[in-house]
C-alpha cells in the first residue's frame, strides 16, 4: 500500500542529521545506516550510504533515479545460490 501524500515521505531523523553533517563537511565517506525503511530524498543525491542487510553494510551511491525509493530496495537481504542441477545429467 502506498503512503498517503499528505503525510509526506518517511525519513529517520538521525539519517537527516548524518546527511546534513556529511554535506556540511564536504567529505565523501560512507554513511552507515540501519534504516532500510527510510525514503531517499533529493538532498541525498551524491552521497554514499552503507545500508545494513543483516550481515554487512552494502554501499549504495545515491543518484537521481533512486529518489522516492526506499534504501532497503538497493541492499538485498537474501542470496540465491541456484537450484540443484539434474542428477541424471551429471551421471551420464
From Swiss-Prot:
Pfam family, one: Ribosomal_S19
GO terms assigned for molecular function: rRNA binding; structural constituent of ribosome
UniProtKB keywords: Ribonucleoprotein, Ribosomal protein, RNA-binding, rRNA-binding
Transmembrane segments: none
Top-level division of the source organism's lineage: Bacteria
Any one Gene Ontology BP term: ribosomal small subunit assembly
Cellular compartments per GO CC: cytoplasm; small ribosomal subunit
Annotated Gene3D superfamilies: 30s Ribosomal Protein S19, Chain A
Family according to the record: Belongs to the universal ribosomal protein uS19 family.
Function: Protein S19 forms a complex with S13 that binds strongly to the 16S ribosomal RNA.
Annotated protein name in UniProt: Small ribosomal subunit protein uS19
Amino acid at each position: 500500500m502506498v503512503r498517503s501524500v499528505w503525510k509526506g515521505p518517511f525519513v529517520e531523523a538521525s539519517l537527516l542529521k548524518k546527511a546534513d553533517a556529511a554535506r556540511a563537511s564536504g567529505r565523501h565517506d560512507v554513511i552507515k545506516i540501519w534504516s532500510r525503511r527510510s525514503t531517499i530524498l533529493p538532498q541525498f543525491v551524491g552521497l554514499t550510504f552503507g545500508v545494513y542487510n543483516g550481515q554487512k553494510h552494502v554501499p549504495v551511491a545515491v543518484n537521481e533515479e533512486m529518489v522516492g525509493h526506499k534504501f532497503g530496495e538497493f541492499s538485498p537481504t537474501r542470496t540465491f545460490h541456484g537450484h540443484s542441477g539434474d542428477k541424471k545429467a551429471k551421471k551420464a
